[in-house]
């Protein structure tokens, strides 16, 4: 269900804003998007896994809050991020 550490490190390298960046909104949103995608695949197979579904909804909410924060702070970075991640908003 969870993404591997290697995949997480790839996402951090791709979306970081500077060399030691692991906590910028872009990185957090990219990691959450990968986790949401993986959990979505799990839930397609295990339809009655309501515990994981609740976790998915919490992740989607956290990502939405981060996206709203980024949109309010820097619209250009926000637009580039949703385009590169393929998020509909």
From Swiss-Prot:
The keyword GTP-binding does not apply. Belongs to the universal ribosomal protein uS15 family. This is Small ribosomal subunit protein uS15. Keywords: Ribonucleoprotein, Ribosomal protein, RNA-binding, rRNA-binding. InterPro entries: Ribosomal_uS15, Ribosomal_uS15_bac-type, uS15_NS1_RNA-bd_sf. One of its GO terms (molecular function) is structural constituent of ribosome. GO terms for biological process: translation. Signal peptide: none annotated. The gene is rpsO. It comes from Staphylococcus saprophyticus subsp. saprophyticus (strain ATCC 15305 / DSM 20229 / NCIMB 8711 / NCTC 7292 / S-41). It comes from the Bacteria. Part of the 30S ribosomal subunit. Forms a bridge to the 50S subunit in the 70S ribosome, contacting the 23S rRNA. GO terms for cellular component: cytosolic small ribosomal subunit. Pfam families: Ribosomal_S15 (PF00312). One of the primary rRNA binding proteins, it binds directly to 16S rRNA where it helps nucleate assembly of the platform of the 30S subunit by binding and bridging several RNA helices of the 16S rRNA.
């Amino acid at each position: 269900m969870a993404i591997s550490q290697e995949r997480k490190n790839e996402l951090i390298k791709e979306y970081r804003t500077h060399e030691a960046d692991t906590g910028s909104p872009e990185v957090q949103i990219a990691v959450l998007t990968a986790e949401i995608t993986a959990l979505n695949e799990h839930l397609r197979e295990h339809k009655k896994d309501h515990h994981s579904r609740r976790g998915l909804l919490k992740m989607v909410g956290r990502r939405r809050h981060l996206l709203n924060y980024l949109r309010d702070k820097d619209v250009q970075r926000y637009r580039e991020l949703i385009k590169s991640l393929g998020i509909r908003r």
